[in-house]
């Protein structure tokens, strides 16, 4: 095979050589015309320069030595990328996936979360919003809103971006308010499964020095799956995203930016089918417990920038809070289902239910960066910075298990008031009132 392939290459090369000799005079005659045409083509064709902040300074992507993927808002729009999970399809080396129905795993080049972790475990891929470190991994479940671009940096980034960036960093850059004039757009999407999605973004110049940009995304969609026991619609979507961004020009070379972003999800939850579920349809399952999923995520940020001449001073501060509430069938089966294989073959599944699991994640950050505008001694770019970080996680799991397998179905129907239980529930959680 190798000899045959080599023969073909040599044969084609010979023909090309002969062809070049035969038409060489013609090429010389047309050389001037071709040169002029090529010059015109070069003038009319140019590659758009992409500006990124991968090294905490604005510079052309072609000048950055790091491995960076920069995705513009137009590219995200064209490819229908609406959240972090969608980035996996178009970003080399990046994996973002939903896990266990309400959590997210993320890795870059295999470094990060490959399996689900507990509520306080942090991935090895850092998330930033307009340069502000976002600590809660529940923020990966939010929808994109009014994005300018997304930068994905592959490889260790701890020197510039700090903790949790061994695998890399994702930086989401939002569109800035502008004082150039009023600008707005809105659209409505309607699809199958009852999908109704509305979006809008509006820029308002308040004065010569103050402008604001406000955006919203509202999504409603029926579920893709059904629980045949209680008729619950699963894998549905009921999301709302809001963002308000304000830019104040405090001087000729300084500015203050204030923004607030809010995301809320109130869904029935994800379809997590058990291994021995008897329903043949992959989009149907049989579970005796109802499920519920609620997530609220909010961030208030402030960014102050001033040009000092030789360097640029940037101060970033934020307060963040993520609240999550989950109810689910933790055994993934209907009461009475048995193990079909393995060491427990023939034995029934132990009924279990989260009633509920809750997490409250509160974060405060304060960061100062001084970034050189001109190289030191003509060849050294430098950055000096400091970061204050306060991160608190409060996680509660109330799990009910029928260890004796004597449960009646109506005792674990998911109808209960969270945190309000009779005293008997402490010793007998399967009492009907628990």
Which residues make up each language-model segment?
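Outer-membrane beta-barrel pore domains and translocons
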Residues: 55, 173, 187-193, 217-219, ...
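Mobile, glycine-rich extracellular loop/lid and propeptide segments
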Residues: 101, 106, 143, 181, ...
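Flexible glycine-rich, low-complexity coil/linker segments exposed to the extracellular/periplasmic environment
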Residues: 343-348, 409-434
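N-terminal Sec signal peptide and the immediately downstream disordered periplasmic leader
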Residues: 1-12, 17-79, 85-90, 203, ...
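Acidic, small-polar-rich N-terminal luminal/periplasmic segments of exported/outer-membrane proteins
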Residues: 41-180
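Outer-membrane beta-barrel domain signature, strongest for Gram-negative TonB-dependent receptors
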Residues: 209, 231, 235-382, 389-393
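Outer-membrane beta-barrel architecture
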Residues: 18, 86, 107, 171, ...
């Amino acid at each position: 095979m190798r000899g045959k392939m080599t023969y073909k290459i040599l044969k084609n090369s010979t023909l090309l050589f002969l062809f070049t000799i035969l038409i060489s005079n013609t090429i010389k005659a047309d050389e001037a015309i071709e040169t002029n045409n090529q010059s015109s083509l070069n003038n009319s064709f140019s590659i758009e320069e992409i500006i990124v902040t991968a090294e905490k300074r604005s510079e052309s992507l072609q000048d950055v030595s790091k491995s960076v993927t920069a995705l513009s808002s137009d590219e995200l729009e064209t490819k229908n990328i609406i959240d972090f999970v969608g980035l996996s399809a178009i970003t080399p080396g990046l994996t973002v996936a939903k896990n266990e129905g309400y959590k997210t795993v993320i890795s870059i080049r295999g470094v990060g979360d490959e399996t689900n972790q507990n509520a306080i475990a942090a991935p090895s891929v850092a998330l930033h919003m307009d340069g502000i470190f976002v600590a809660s991994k529940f923020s990966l479940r939010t929808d994109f809103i009014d994005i300018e671009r997304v930068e994905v940096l592959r490889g260790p980034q701890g020197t510039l971006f700090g903790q949790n960036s061994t695998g890399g960093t994702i930086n989401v850059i939002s569109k800035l308010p502008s004082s150039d004039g009023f600008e707005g757009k809105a659209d409505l999407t309607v699809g199958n499964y009852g999908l109704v999605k509305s979006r809008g973004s509006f820029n308002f110049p308040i004065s010569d020095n103050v402008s604001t940009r406000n955006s919203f995304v509202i999504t409603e969609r029926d579920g893709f799956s059904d629980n045949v026991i209680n008729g619950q619609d699963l894998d549905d979507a009921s999301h709302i995203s809001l963002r308000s961004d304000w830019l104040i020009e405090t001087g000729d070379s300084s500015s203050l930016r204030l923004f607030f972003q809010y995301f809320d999800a109130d869904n029935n939850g994800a379809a997590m089918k058990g291994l021995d579920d008897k329903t043949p349809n992959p989009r149907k399952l049989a579970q005796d417990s109802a499920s519920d999923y609620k997530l609220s995520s909010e961030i208030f940020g402030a960014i102050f920038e001033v040009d000092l001449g030789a360097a640029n001073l940037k101060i970033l501060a934020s307060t963040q809070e993520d609240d999550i509430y989950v109810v689910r069938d933790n055994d993934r089966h209907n009461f009475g289902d048995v193990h079909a294989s393995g060491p427990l073959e023939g034995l029934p599944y132990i009924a279990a239910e989260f009633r509920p699991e809750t997490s409250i994640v509160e974060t405060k950050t304060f960061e100062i960066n001084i970034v050189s505008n001109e190289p030191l001694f003509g060849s050294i770019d430098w950055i000096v910075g400091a970061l204050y970080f306060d991160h608190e996680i409060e996680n509660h799991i109330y799990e009910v298990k029928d260890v004796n397998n004597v449960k009646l179905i109506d005792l674990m129907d998911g109808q209960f008031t969270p945190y309000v239980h009779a005293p008997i529930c402490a010793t007998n959680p399967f009492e009907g009132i628990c």
